[in-house]
Amino acid sequence: MPNGRPVQNGNRLPTSNWAACLEAEAQAAAQREAARLAAQRQAEQARAAAAQAKQRQPEKPIAPQKAVLRQGDVVFFTGDSLMQGVAPFVQQSLKQQYGIASINLSKQSTGLSYPNFFDWPLTIEQTFKENPNIRLMVMFLGANDPWDFPNPKGGAYLKFQTPEWEAEYLNRVNRILDAAKQHNAQVIWLGMPYMKKKKLDDQMRYLDKLFAAHLKDKVFWIPTAGLLSNGGAEYSDSVEVGGKIVRYRSKDGIHFSVEGQKLLAQAIMQKIEFAQP
């Protein structure tokens, strides 16, 4: 571009053409800048709209981490022989620390598989009706449930671990949850511990996962397997705690020693707080 003017085919463009060329380039640059600014404004408007929409959305309330009890409330203990050994220690702590009364209906050899032997959903429904001050139910069962059981609709037995078995079993769990909800009662539910015999342990691992998934956000859940094994991933009669060997399990590989019962009782108490009037 000699002498400041553009050259085309070796010849300098006339001054008028040069000016037109510069004007066209300036217009193109202005259009590009206008497009850039428009895109920037649109992006800023989109971000502002998204921020406003987020502010308008109600925040999801934070779920309480503990069951809350007040003076005059009653705690209801339910479950099988696993609960039978644990409940008395919790009852004692509730009474001594907070003056809270309790009802303990835990019963050995019971579960949800055979309501003809003992009907937990019905028993719980009746107990709530008879005791309107119950504000917390603590549940610990399942060890007696890994069996095929009769189909309430008739026909062949429902096979353990099948979808049909799960559906009916969880229907019974739901009856318990519904009874508690209807009476404004909170629920603490204990998961299944490791068991010494592999077959039973496999069955308990299945039930533990079933409970944990179904009860999520519905109860205060206490996993017991890792607790009783001091974080281990399998059954252990005894564990090392603070440099000492402590036996948490009984010789049958199912139930708990007194120390194990106290450990679970402490875990339950840690899920409870007392609100001053």
Regions found by a protein language model. Name each.
Residues 143-144, 150, 174-208:
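Active-site segments of SGNH/GDSL-like serine hydrolases
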Residues 83, 91, 95, 99, ...:
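Sec-exported extracytoplasmic/periplasmic mature domains
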Residues 65-163:
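Conserved SGNH/GDSL esterase-like catalytic core that processes O-acyl groups on lipids
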Residues 82, 86, 90, 120-124, ...:
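Stable alpha-helical elements in mature extracytoplasmic
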Residues 138, 188-190, 220-222:
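Hydrophobic/aromatic beta-strand patches that form the interior of the parallel beta-sheet core
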Residues 1-74:
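N-terminal secretory targeting modules
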Residues 194-277:
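Catalytic His-Asp segment of secreted/periplasmic serine-dependent ester chemistry enzymes
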Residues 158-170, 249-254:
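A short acidic, glycine-rich active-site loop
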